Amino acid sequence: MTQLSQYYVPGLHVEDHVVQVPLHWNWAAGAAQPDASSFAGEHIDLFYRLVSSAQNVHADLPLLLFLQGGPGGMGPRPMSAQSIPWLSEAVKHFRVVLIDQRGTGRSSRVDSSLIRRRGQNARETADFLKNFLADSIIRDCEFLRTTVFNSAQWVTLGQSYGGFLTMAYVSLFPASIAASFVTGGIPHIPMNAREVYEHTVPRMMAKTKEYYGLYPDDEAVVGRIADFLSSEKVLLPNGDPASVRRLQMLGGDFGMKPSFERMHWTVDTAFNGEYLSDGFLMELFSSTTSYGSELYWVLQEFIYANKEIEPINWAANDVLRSTKQFDESSRPLMLIGEAALPEIFDEDSALRAFRPAMDELMSDTQWGTVYDEDQLARNDIPIHAAVYFDDMYVDSGLQLDTLSRVGNSHAWVTNEFEHDGARMGAVFEHLYAEALSRGHLEKLFLK
């Protein structure tokens, strides 16, 4: 481990660290240590931050590992103790570990320029990318826990995809965790990508209709934009094509608040006379570009892969194409939320280098073991989960179905928040208080 720096942001003490981890782990589930062969091959950086409140810098508080949403999400960068609601509460009770998951942020980031530099063929690139999924991420975390933090049990907090990682951690290394919190991110187990989109595509449609209901004039404006993009060759400021599909991808924000208002003001100045305004095209680019979040789209459908499966084969695209309301020519134009489509790998210059490997991955049937249903059924780790009833990204019904088969799990179902509730309100505070009241954190604070 190398400490890179330490500093304060208002109300928080922050330490930056980096450790080297194998690109490919050979580490049996539940084993105390990885196989020595893991360290014989290529290595990558794992960057993490240790965050404490300014008042508790030297306090011996228990550890909380934050598992970031994504996939392909780097750890949050706090501006102050108050800038992230869950963090402002967490540092009262814990030292918080923020990791940049492998391939993101400062952890040997994977982007199109790296893919080009590696110079591998499509199959080799696909195999390389498989090293950036949950089975590897959890082993990174476990390596950190055993080598840096003296094998101390820690609490985990998983937001969105971080909940998928939580279920993987509970499956693979259950003895490492004292308690877990999850916000908007219980995966459906057993997993099936097409099933997921069959549940979420209707939610995309409902969200679009809700938006048009709030701002009726926007329905015509969005349709007019789509008509213009269909009839003219329009380029975004970076030279990428501005397509109707790219316009539809603005719906990816609709699971957050205040997304409808953001969309309303985005299209408010879409036209300059008869033509699309430069400002709107810049907004379309900045809201839909994959620069800086390449793995979010590259790995999007493969977070539903576990062990041996049928080929995923562009599951979201298949469901959307079979739902005529999402055709580019349909009016009112339906907007799309969180769907990795083949078109974006052709149109978005940040993703084109990944396109050949995507076709390989979409046809693969063999994946790492991420979830152990038997282990989850006998789980005794307290898991407190916030399930957002109207969640557009992670269907609440599927979440509750999974939790019904996970031991010692406790769901708080609420329609007060959208998918980003942990960043917008006192969601973690509620879950923490519930766990405390049930005695689920008692052993952490016994001296």
Please provide the spans of the model-predicted regions:
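N-terminal, polar/Ser/Thr-rich
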Residues: 1-7
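Catalytic His-Asp charge-relay segment
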Residues: 250, 380-387, 391, 410-411
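Gly/Pro-rich cap/lid or specificity-loop segments adjacent to the active site
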Residues: 8-44, 50-238, 352, 369-376, ...
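Alpha/beta-hydrolase fold active-site neighborhood
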Residues: 234-364
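Conserved alpha/beta-hydrolase "acid-adjacent" motif
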Residues: 259-262, 391-398
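Short, proline-enriched alpha-helix->beta-strand connector loops that line the catalytic pocket
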Residues: 245, 377-383, 406-408
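Short alpha-helix in the alpha/beta-hydrolase fold that links the catalytic acid
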Residues: 80, 266-268, 315, 395-404
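C-terminal structured domains
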Residues: 385, 400-412, 426
